[in-house]
């Protein structure tokens, strides 16, 4: 048995024994007619939307996911028994009908703590009940935001209060149970600024749970205070514990529904200030894919951000980079960012936002940015890859092997996926690909009817970035047959 101290967790995936290469026969397998890629866009508008025409143009441009804002802690864009409804229409139903008509998944965007778009009466009641966040100096969230240059006319609930956590649980589960969503995409699942939160509830809970003797609040936990690090740890645990509660409830209710996150890009800031240690959330299996908000003006900066984040993920789940179309504005830099992201091994992209994207869609089609139909990586069968140690690793977390080296793997194939049906059969081809998508070699074909663990190996001569892939077909328990493609975390062949 090979020692495998490092593993590639291939998000919904399947790869089997690899021992030698043979010529590719693409037409023998329907999966070769596709690529594996999530192509999405965030729709942050809170106005009425022409959902049918929007989904029609997105579909024609090759998009397969949308992330529409649907609710916050203060309002919902659909009828709710828990949240006040804004607008006159059930926007979520209209969105789902249109998106599913065109084969597009809907991952409803949920903002957990902010009372955004909510009526003044709700804001007032929450503040009177002491349920909102307060800064170090006792100022409410809206005034703290002003200090950082943000004019926000709403308050934010404190996640240390059980009634606020129950509110989040209740309205998210109401959405999951009442609507046929494909996923729930969390945004702002964090604190927004460093001086938050220092309310009385945070004080009482921190003292109780830490067992520390606090003599000067909040000075003891602020800046150079003796218990600052303990308080930051407590804030991070406060946030992840809430994520655990709600994602477990969603997955227990309906395993098909994906949970995902609009992750913050600045790793130090999100760790210390936001209390959003999202890479730990990934390691605990709380998310089904992640979409870091890697907004930048230049394509090269976009890829630089990806390189910083890759070592924290290492293929544990699909990575869909957040492309800031609103900042790049023109088509060419957006196109280049997507191409560079593909080249380094991201699994797809999500653009921000729809208003900036729509004027570019004709150019998307003309340039063939999404020319091949795409299969969603997060809907493929699940597999874990265990890769032997090479002794070298790049800054992106890629294992580095010398040209001509034999790379040994162990693969754990599981007959489960984020689907509405179970899986009864999986068959297809294991191939070696470049990160650009070019298939280098077909390695072996398999036909399985049960979970399998296999040892495998492959030899690569030419320098470059590679991914193992399974181009396959799965038979579901209801008889449906679906193609899928799944890929490993990249590895590098290099003589340097």
Report the location of each language-model feature.
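Active-site-adjacent "subsite" loops/lids of carbohydrate-active enzymes
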Residues: 32-38, 107-179
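The substrate-binding groove and active-site-proximal loops of carbohydrate-active enzymes
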Residues: 39-47, 79-89, 151-166, 227-239, ...
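Catalytic domains of carbohydrate-active enzymes, especially glycoside hydrolases
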Residues: 51-75, 178-179, 287-289
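Aromatic-lined substrate-binding rim segments of carbohydrate-active enzymes
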Residues: 72-111, 234-253
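Aromatic- and acidic-residue-enriched segments that line the glycan-binding/catalytic groove
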Residues: 79-86, 114-150, 188-222
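Glycoside hydrolase catalytic-domain groove-lining segments
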Residues: 209-330
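Substrate-binding cleft of secreted/luminal carbohydrate-active enzymes
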Residues: 286-302, 309, 317-386
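Short, compositionally biased P/S/T/A/G/V-rich stretches that sit at domain boundaries
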Residues: 369-406, 414, 496
